[in-house]
Structure formats: C-alpha cells, structure tokens
Amino acid sequence: MTDLSKERIKFWRPRQLPQVELLHASYVKQSFSRHFHDGFALGVVEQGALRFSYRGERLTAFPGCVNLVIPGEAHDGEAAGADGWTYRMFYLDNAVMERAVFELSGKEKQLPFIAAGVLEDTALALAIARLHQQLETDELPLLEQQSRLLSLLTMFVACYGEKQSQR
C-alpha cells in the first residue's frame, strides 16, 4: 500500500449543529501551509503525531493530546513521523464558543483566549474523541448533541481559558 493510499478524509457538518464542522482524517504525506481559521479548531490525535508551528513555537501533538488553534492565529501542519497522523477535529463558529463563555460568566460576545496549541489532558482528549465519534454516527438526539457539545466546551474554557477578550 502506498503512503497516499493510507490517506483518508471525512469532512462534514452535522445536520443539526450548523455552527459546527467536523473532520476525521488520516494523513501521511499531507502538509498544510501557513493559514488561519475564522473560528476555533479543537481536536485530538488518535494515531501518529501532528507537528505544527503556532504562536512562535514548533509543537507536536501525540495520541491523547488535544490540539487547538484560536481564531485568526496562523499555523501550519504536517506529519511528525513517517507514519503520518490520524485526528478528529471540531471547527467551531465563534458563536458556539461565545455561548460557552456566557454559560460560565454571564458575559456576552466574549471569546476565550487559550495560548497553548497542545494540551496534555487525557480526560479532555477522550471527551473530544467520544463526542466526535457520536456525532459521526449521528446516534444522539438533537438536544443531547447540543447539551454534550456545550458541556464539553464549558469544561474546556473553564480549565484553559486564560482571559476573555471582546470580539
């Protein structure tokens, strides 16, 4: 099997969560040139390792690590080894993160700031992977999807949000 035949990409928007996009991908040769996202990107590496430049650092996310980028922050990405990497990503509209901040603080239209690009938090990584898998199989009713996503994001913001800034 060639390296490229090992690559696979599934990108979708859950029909009941229009402010969320999901990616489940395996890459071997793929590399991403410097770019940014308008919203938050939050994910977990399942296999291999992802290396990326972010906020002036060269970071590596291994299985069990959470990788993330905040809106507007330029980054790149590539395999950290010959076997590539497999990961699950949430791409979140800012309104989704603003809701999580509101649930915690009562403050509207504020986004959390998280400086780290890689978090070594096994419990959070497992929670991200589990919800992502559930959304992929579409096994949860709408209210449960919304509730679990909000719960995950409020936990994330409560643990790692360093400060909140006006949009």
Regions found by a protein language model. Give the residues of each.
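Proteins with a high burden of low-complexity, intrinsically disordered sequence enriched in S/T/G/P/A and R
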Residues: 56, 92, 157, 166-167
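N-terminal regulatory/effector-sensing and dimerization cores
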Residues: 3-110, 137-138
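Amphipathic alpha-helical segments enriched in hydrophobic/aromatic residues interleaved with Lys/Arg
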Residues: 105-166
